[in-house]
Amino acid sequence: MQNIIKNGKESNSVPLQGLGVDSPLGGEGIFYHFTFSEVAPTFAEILDFIKSTNLEEEHPAIVFIKEVLPQLNLDTGISGYYILKNLEELRLKDGLICIENIEFNLGRQLCGYIKEATQVALFVCTAGEYFTQLTNRLNEQGDIMEAYILDAIGSLTVEKAMDKIQESLKIKMLEKELKISNRYSPGYCNWPLSDQQNLFQLIGENPTGIALSDSCLMTPRKSVSGLIGLGKNLKLHEYGCKICNNTTCIYRRILHE
């Protein structure tokens, strides 16, 4: 049975959505559930993300944000999960790692960032289907500005949820005298999106409800996945946005703009 963390507290109850997969390190997958208020972006963060920091109070964007934030407390699908795996091989020159005989084409940049790792945490996290449903409804109504803002709030929400999971992982690993890397996702930092298939294969059945399409896109739409390196001698590297080819990356927007 995996551990469950609800509202910051850990329990041994079984989620209705399914069971996780035992870790080969003797540990177990850990499931997190959050209320929107626990991971909600601030008003300032939303305005900064959509590059609208100097709007008047009566601007439609400001009015919409004030109206929609309380509604998002109805979102019960914000959740995340990670499972620990041994890092069997890392070939820096080839930009490859191997986990349970499955190769990942991380590229030399990311391999360099986790070259001291001996284990990895494979993760998934979602802001839930509620964001997708509301955004689709707004688009159908022709409320394009509102749909764009809600999409931005969803992006920020899932990242803030993953921030909390990463911090929890950091604390747990410190107890084992292990350090962690930043988190990295397929489709970012020059890591091919196609590696999503292998990532989900290793994560296995989990209670987040995230599904992967044949084109490697996740549903619910506001979901993230990836890995975090773990190791005693691991060094924390900043994201290499200056040498990354992805000009639309959410991390570039959050960290540097």
Locations of the language-model features?
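Catalytic cores of large soluble enzymes that bind and process phosphate-bearing ligands
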Residues: 57-64, 150-153, 157, 161, ...
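Structural signal for hydrophobic packing residues in well-ordered secondary-structure cores
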Residues: 69-76, 169, 173, 245-248
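Short terminal or interdomain "cap/linker" segment that borders an active site or interface and mediates
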Residues: 176-251
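Internal, well-folded beta-alpha domain core
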Residues: 142-202
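Short cysteine/histidine-rich zinc-coordinating motifs and their immediately flanking basic loops
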Residues: 253-257
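Glycine-biased, low-complexity coil/linker segments
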Residues: 17-20, 24-28
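Active-site helix-to-loop segments that bind/position phosphate- or nucleotide-bearing substrates
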Residues: 2-9, 29-147
